[in-house]
Structure formats: C-alpha cells, structure tokens
Regions:
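N-terminal intrinsically disordered/low-complexity leader segments
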Residues: 1-28, 39, 191, 217-236
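Solvent-exposed, amphipathic alpha-helical segments
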Residues: 32, 36-43, 90-94, 125-129, ...
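Helix-turn-helix
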Residues: 32, 36-74, 78
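Residues in soluble alpha-helical coiled-coils and helical-bundle/repeat scaffolds
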Residues: 70-74, 78, 134, 138, ...
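Hydrophobic alpha-helical connector segments
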Residues: 78, 91-121, 174-178
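Short, basic, alpha-helical segments at the C-terminal edge of helix-turn-helix-like DNA-binding modules
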Residues: 81-87
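Amphipathic alpha-helical packing segments from all-alpha helical-bundle domains
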Residues: 88-89, 93, 116-127, 137-164, ...
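Hydrophobic/aromatic-rich alpha-helical bundle segments in the mid-to-C-terminal region
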Residues: 140-144, 160-236
Length: 236
C-alpha cells in the first residue's frame, strides 16, 4: 500500500531549541513506530497486528519497541491518538487551504473536501478499529475517551476554520450532522464496494450541501474577515 497519509518512514523531526539530538532521535523512533502501527492496522487488521510485525515494518529492534511501548495496549492507545491527530491535521490543513482567499466560507466545496478525506486509509483504519472494538473490551475502553477527545477537537477547530459559520445558531447541529452523515455514507460505500462518485452518493451529497447551506443561512451575509475581527475584539 502506498499512500502519503500512512508511512512506515515518516519525515523525521528536526532538532528544536531545548532538545538534544538524542531526544529528537527518540521522538523520530516513536513516530516511526506509530506510523508503522497504522500501516499494519490497514494491511493486516487490528487483531492480526503484532508488535513483531510493527517492529519489522518500522525497522526498529524489539528493544527499541519495548523502550517506547512496554505493552501492546500502550502501543494501541498511542496509535489511536496518533490516528485521530492525523485526521484532525488533514481536516484543518485542507479546509484552511480551501478557504484561504474566500470572502465567505465555501460550504458545498468544504463538504466535498471532507468527503474526499473519508476515502483515505486513515478513515478506513478508524472503521477497522470501530469494528474490532465491538468484541474487544480493552480496545473499546481505549477508543471511547479518544473518540470524545476527537469530537471536541474537531468542533473546536471547526469554529476556528469557519469563523463566519461559527456565528450561526445552527453551527453545532450543521457541523455534527455533516460529519455523522458523511462518515455513515463512507462506511456504507466502503462495505458495499460502491464508488464514492456513484450517482446514488452524489445525489445524497447534493442534498446535504443544500440542507447545510440552508441551516447556516442566518450568517450568509457575514464574511470571514468580519467574523475574525469580531472574535478578536471579544477577547480583548
């Protein structure tokens, strides 16, 4: 599998002020292990991912693995957090880029961008973990708080990325409904082998774009710069 969102050889961190070469090397090794873990989740599934497979994929010794993660449960917990953070970073990066020069937040285009993100291996791994957690109590206990943290962070970042929309009385329900609906459609299309560009899917997406735009119509005349200025003034 070759995909830029998951790599067993991630870009290495550069030494920063206050950090020694050894500290940076340790962080690089940890990151490489986490990337390799996500790769293994994607390739072999959760239950077939072993620390031996991860260490081999990460090209680190068993000793290095044990230094960072003495137990598989610790590795899984860190990998789940790493997965969620990668999804959040991807979401923020792409949606900020989309709206960089926009006067008003591009709602329909934003829904399309998020939909494309749900076709990535990152979301497929998330689905793999959800299914595995149904019969794995330890994974379930790990996922539950991580999912809550993800949802809080997703909502918080959405308010920052879409300053004008965040002023709407319907902002929370609009963003939550969009995420839940798109994730549900993505799971359905993946499980049935249906194309994300099928007429069936596109018809639903068109309805969602129109519905969400309608929910946020109360702030349609407020531009992004005005909203950001108002937010800045309220903090003073």
């Amino acid at each position: 599998m070759k995909d830029p969102t998951i790599s067993s050889s991630p870009a290495k961190l550069r030494p920063s002020a206050g950090k020694s070469w050894q500290q940076t090397k340790s962080e690089n090794t940890r990151l490489q292990i986490l990337e390799a873990t996500l790769y293994c989740f994607s390739e072999y599934g959760f239950h077939n991912t072993t620390t031996e497979k991860v260490s081999k994929q990460a090209k680190v010794s068993r000793g290095a693995m044990l230094h960072h993660f003495s137990q598989r449960a610790e590795l899984v917990r860190a990998a789940v957090e790493h997965l969620h953070e990668k999804r959040l970073q991807e979401y923020e990066r792409d949606l900020r880029a989309l709206n960089e020069d926009a006067k008003h937040t591009l709602v329909a285009e934003g829904i399309e961008v998020f939909w494309r993100q749900l076709q990535s291996p990152l979301f497929a791994i998330y689905c793999e973990l959800l299914v595995a957690a149904r019969t794995d109590d330890e994974l379930k206990r790990t996922l539950a708080p991580a999912q809550e943290a993800f949802e809080r962070a997703w909502q918080s970042r959405s308010q920052t990325i879409f300053p004008d929309l965040a002023l709407s009385k319907q902002f929370w329900i609009a963003t939550a409904a969009t995420r839940y609906m798109l994730e549900g459609i993505a799971i359905n299309t993946q499980s049935r082998g249906r194309s994300p560009d099928s007429a069936y899917t596109q018809e639903i997406l068109s309805w969602l774009k129109e519905t969400v735009s309608g929910l946020l119509s109360d702030v349609s005349r407020i531009d992004r710069n005005t909203a950001m200025s108002a937010k800045g003034a309220s903090k003073e």
